[in-house]
Amino acid sequence: MRNFTLLVLFSFMLPLQAQRADFKEINFAKAENIANRYEGESLTNLPGLAYGLSSQLDSEAARFRAIYYWVTHNITGDYDLMYRNERARKKLRNDPEGLRLWNDQFKKEVFIKLRHDRETLCTGYAYLIQVLSELVGLECKIIDGYAASDLKKNTLGIPNHSWNAIKLDGKWYLCDATWSAGYTDMSSFLFEFDYDNAFFLME
């Protein structure tokens, strides 16, 4: 695996040829249909959900596709969580102990909201992708770093985004369920599902 560190600079300007070349022989329709059968499924039984999404699929790529497709079509982005976290982290950027305490408290809130409401921010998306992947025997990592927009603004400081690296058939790929799932309508501050496959399995 590439040497990913906390200070990864993640830009989505990468070529996406690997996705098409490595998986062009796989029809993901079955995986997506299975994911659709579990629409609205609770997160109270993650092993059961992982089994349901993967048990009828043979390849690692298809199993991961079912997981990724389910997460990006069933987990809502929460603008309030994102805004509060960004504001607090900026305020505490020069206070390591205060930032640590905030992170500990906020992380608990994020996971409670994810479990009960299926709403989250990038941390929750990446966590859920990792847990479900590991439950079906796939190696998956969470990567913390910077969103591409912050690179352009030259405002690097505390890492502010999380995504995943997934190992399929011995090869590592990047994916970002947060950006695949949709966007926040800034006129209403409500999340709109709008799946974008560009962030699925990037080399």
Label every model-predicted segment.
Residues F12, L43, F64, C122-A126, ...:
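Short alpha-helical patches at coil-to-helix transitions and adjacent helical residues
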Residues L7, Q56, K153-T155:
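Residues embedded in well-ordered secondary-structure elements
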Residues M1-A21:
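Bacterial Sec-dependent N-terminal signal peptides
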Residues G124-M202:
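Hydrophobic/aromatic-rich core segments of domains that either
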Residues F12, V71, I75-Y79, V136-C140, ...:
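A generic secondary-structure signal for well-formed alpha-helical elements
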Residues L7, D78-Y79, A181:
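Hydrophobic positions within alpha-helical membrane elements
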Residues R20-T120:
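Secondary-structure boundary elements
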